[in-house]
Amino acid sequence: MCGDSPIPFVFFLSLGLTCGPAKTTYATDSQWRSIAGPVTAQIIRIIDGDTLEVDAHPWPGHAVRVSVRLRGIDTPERRSRCAGQRAAAQLARNELERLVTGFSTVELINVSGGKYYGCVLADMKAGKRDIASAMLASGLARPYQGGKRHKPECAG
């Protein structure tokens, strides 16, 4: 029980009767599928060149630990059979780490469900820098809008 006095309840009841019922609005199905943001997050670890684990703070006093895949890019895979791709994956991971080092928090924008359970897809900013754009500019990521991913030939 929040309090012993009926006065607050009576006040809000009389306000409702005087002003009439408030209009209730509900989110549409598409609104439930994404969060415009920004959502403040602290980076826990860099997983690879396009995925990070963060503690996101969608509401005051609450944190959600989640993997975030950067929207619009793809980087080489760490678990590739090709040694050249594994080396490129490490370079991409190092670049992502460099881009976010020194920022105590980042912002997640346009957060939506990812392709795989437990991962969300989002745009990310560290300061004023868009991280996906910076990864593309580095040459260590390629544009990716979903669907079949590019698989380079293995030279060795």
List each model region and its residues:
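Small beta-barrel nucleic-acid-binding modules, primarily SNase/OB-fold domains
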Residues: 2-156
